[in-house]
Amino acid sequence: MTATDASTELGLPAFRTGTELVPALPEGQTQTGKDFTSDQEVRWCPGCGDYAVLKAVQGFLPDLGLRRENIVFVSGIGCSSRFPYYLDTFGMHSIHGRAPSIATGLATAREDLSVWVVTGDGDALSIGGNHLIHALRRNVNMTILLFNNRIYGLTKGQYSPTSETGKVTKSTPVGSIDQPFNPVSLALGAEASFVARTIDSDRKHLTSVLSAAAAHRGTSLVEIYQNCPIFNDGAFEDLKGRDTKDESIIPLVHGEPIVFAGGAKGVVRDPATGGVKVAQVEEVGLDAVLVHDAHNTDPTVAFAISRLTAADYLHQAPIGIFRQVERPTYDDQARAQVSAAVDAAAASPDERLGALLGAGDTWTVV
Amino acid sequence: MSKQVQQLDRVIIRFAGDSGDGMQLTGDRFTQESAIFGNDLMTLPNFPAEIRAPQGTIPGVSSFQVHFADHQILTAGDAPDVLVAMNPAALKANLGDLPKGATVIVDSHDFTKRNLSKAGYDADPLESIGDAGSVLGEYAVHPVDLTGMTVEAVKEFGLSRKDAARAKNMFALGLLSWMYGRPTEPTIGFLTKRFAKVPDIREANIAAFKAGWNFGETTEAFAVSYEIKPAPMAPGTYRNISGNLALAYGLVAAGVRSDLPVFLGSYPITPASDILHELSKHKSFGVTTLQAEDEIAGIGAAIGASYAGALGVTTTSGPGIALKSEAIGLAVMTELPLLVVNVQRGGPSTGLPTKTEQADLLQAMFGRNGEAPVAIVAPQSPGDCFDAALEAARIAVTYRTPVMLLSDGYIANGSEPWRIPEISELPTIDPGFATAPAVGEDGSTPEFEPYARDPETLARPWAIPGTAGLEHRIGGLEKGDGHGNISYDPANHDKMVRLRQAKIDKIADSLPPLEVDDPSGRARVLVIGWGSTYGPIGAGVRRVRKAGFNVAQAHLRHLNPFPKDLGEILQGYDKILVPEMNLGQLSLLLRAEYLVDAVGFNVVRGLPLKAAELADAIAELVGEAEGVPVDLAQNIDPESTTDLEVAK
């Protein structure tokens, strides 16, 4: 039996949006970014990319049209994990790496909540790597914002699981010998149903990705390239620089050919490796260029595209939604199993408890 | 041929065989028969951690001990009166526990050269039965070809020889059921249901069971059968229940009586997994179970569910608690209701997964960074796991705190008759969720304070998402008193550390006085314990009293906080004995808290304490306290018919 069959059997509609069961604002009522701003002073370093993301999220949340009290932000430990304190929603700043597990319990216990996880490259990929891949595998309805600055900021500058090999940091004075993770490749390998990448400095793109992630039912993983001006300044410079970004960003748009550098370069299949590569469009022709299909149920091509991300200095990276497929969510199915059992029970809970305790081989002493 | 029937007041039987021989099932069936018959009973399953250790070897031996009586008993018994050994390894592994004169029934079929050598026997001990000084010289041995007779009894069903021989445990059960006058219908009913889909296996097992019974009745090898009358028990309806099942039922009941959905986040671990299995069956009570990717995720999900307004529960054993410690600290800091169940096993590290121990008390008390107090509740018997789970839930919800429920392998897998409670007798638990702050006359609403406290309990509000006006942020960083925002203020931290401790201490206001069993009122020695040692301590105390001496007994269900009157009670005795299956963890706490000279009785064999050894230790202390020599054996009243619960 396929997963889809299971959801049909449990009486779930085939498609739901991520926020469908979350109470909306009353008709005619609107919110602004200010409604989502808490009274707490924001304490990131001047110039930190986190400010831009916070502003974008505060600006975007009113667009969801949801009741503020039904939104919960859960974070782990790290600079970005202070995020929930600055939003006037429900929130929990939890422990290192465990936010996805806490959010899993929260999202499974309550269908009426919009659940967000804020995490960093150390939090999500190092200490919390296990929880991340299992959240993605289960496909719990939540959105994970993974702030990737490729460094440990809060502990003052050690290399992270996304730092490039050879990086000289406080804990690697002669260069890191660790092979970095590519978070998008990792998420696709875990068969995540929604995987995207965006950049802190491009508010428009960031907002559009957040919007798609929130609308997706299941675990949405959004990697956000985020600059740390203190310990890893300029890590994403090529993706941001006026003169370099066109050559560095490979924009992914569903249904469009994957071209960049003003249309001069395109992504084509590479028969030699079975993967994909960058080619001059002039040489291969536009017809040979891959048309991006984010809805492909097979993650193979999305994975191949994710490999175009430079592993060392980030001079090239695909940006956009790599994958977005419908798959039954863990929380919907767990609740459906429980509610089917609850609905099938006729007697009162006390009566049924009495029957449960008194079942099996019993004897009576008078 | 009519056989003699002899009256006994109690019997301890141990079934032992290879891990694959079905000894747990055999013991369990005998127990159910005895329970329905109306005997009081206690059981002690004992099995290796390996699912199938090498066949025929001593490490592969699995056993099940059942103690049943015509009166109230407290333990599974120190030493078996009867050993059923299905192979040489089972005989060798258990013979040392038998008192002189014990009955031994062996499956002679399995005493082959190969099996004897696997068990480490140079010569077949069955060949020297009756010889003084031989291996089996001191026992009443009955070699019976259980396998051969089983194969013969089931041949009409056309099973392979291997399948046919597998029914030998039912043959043995039938024989023992005859010997002790057990009712047969429950087992036939059980087999009919269990093997409903495989008629030939079903019929073969029933045939083997009946053949065993008939063999007992007709053979001249067994001249006597025994009768153990039902035990007087308080009126009510009873069932036999294991601790893990009772604990799972207690959690279901806590959900029903609090009107909260139960959410279990758990990772499989011996000996706690049964609770996960059981709770996963009870979705109709609104119970959600999540088998997490690891121990940490299990408790993480439970904390998330608790924040969402469910009764968050996580179940594990010692190694799992070690992994969950940081998350327990988070629940302490965020002051959320949470049940943490630790079914203790032998440690440290992986230790003895299938054996019992109570060496996690100090881990429960102190096993976290910082000042991180949690409430601790410990059940004292299998059936008591039900009430203890309800009590733990009451504390967690009322005081918004993690509660550690300390069960252990002995009561988790052991069973006893349990009077099924009336649902209306069970306590109710009020979640008391915070509601939206009232709008003032000027139209403004007061700022919600997530760390404001109830003056009586010092609990903070349980403010769940979805409640307008209560938006707030919690987390692991220190919280400012009242408003709950991050605070690095030194005075605030000192205050919050003390408040979190004071809240746990406040729980003592809600506890009943500690019951002290001191019938004469003249005892100078108090024996105090906690958890599963209740039975062995009670049995040891009985023996000392039987010998004419005074001794008092008290048992702690609440380990943190202690009952308010504990200090005063301890001060009232000259000597305090603290028996524990650890190196003196409660002793340490009592000494530190009350400055009393608590003396430990500490045995860590992975098995329940033996009542006889305990009785000797109590007697010694009574002798010291009263300045008289105490010899238990000489002082026992020979006319007494009351059980002493010790080895003969």
Segments the model singles out, each with a brief description of its role:
Chain A
Residues 2-30, 39, 230-366:
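Flexible, low-complexity linker and terminal segments
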